[in-house]
C-alpha cells in the first residue's frame, strides 16, 4: 500500500541513497553508485537534508517520503523562500514506480501543504537536458519558465501560481 508521510530523522540516509540512486540513472553516471554517492556527499549536494528540522520543518516547509510496504520509494519537499513563495525540492521517485500516477500524488500532497501555509507561488529548478521527464511533468502541472534565481547554469527555473 502506498503512503505519503513526513520523513523520520532516522530515514534521512535511506532517502539520500534513493535520491543518489535515481540521479545516478538520470544523469547516466558511469561511476559505481557508491563512488558517485561519496563524491556528491563530499560536495555537500544534499546538505539541506542534514538538518531537516531547521531547513524545512522550522521554516514553514515539509519533507515527505512515499512508501510502498514501508519501503521508501520517493521523496518530495517544500522549502520557504519568503512569505509568499516556496520552493519545490527533492522530488524523486524510483524508476520502477514511474508512470503510475505516484508523482502526481506526491505533488498533490505538496500543493495541499503549500496552500495551508498560504504560499502564493511555487518555484523549482531542474535540469532540462537530463531531467526531461521531470521538466515535462512540471509543465503539465502548470509550471512555466522564469529567469534563473540561482547560479547553477545547468538548471532551468520554473514557477507556478498556486
Which stretches of residues belong to each language-model region?
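A generic structural signal for beta-strand entry/edge sites
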Residues: 83-85, 121, 155
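Extreme N-terminal starter segment of soluble prokaryotic enzymes
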Residues: 1-3
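Hydrophobic secondary-structure block in the mid-to-C-terminal portion of proteins
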Residues: 136-142, 146-157
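Conserved GNAT acetyl-CoA-binding A-motif
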Residues: 114-126
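Acetyl-CoA-dependent GNAT
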Residues: 6-89, 94-95, 108-109, 113, ...
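Conserved glycine-rich acetyl-CoA-binding loop
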Residues: 71, 85, 90-108, 117, ...
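Conserved beta-strand-loop-alpha-helix junction that forms the acyl-donor binding cleft
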Residues: 123-134, 151-155
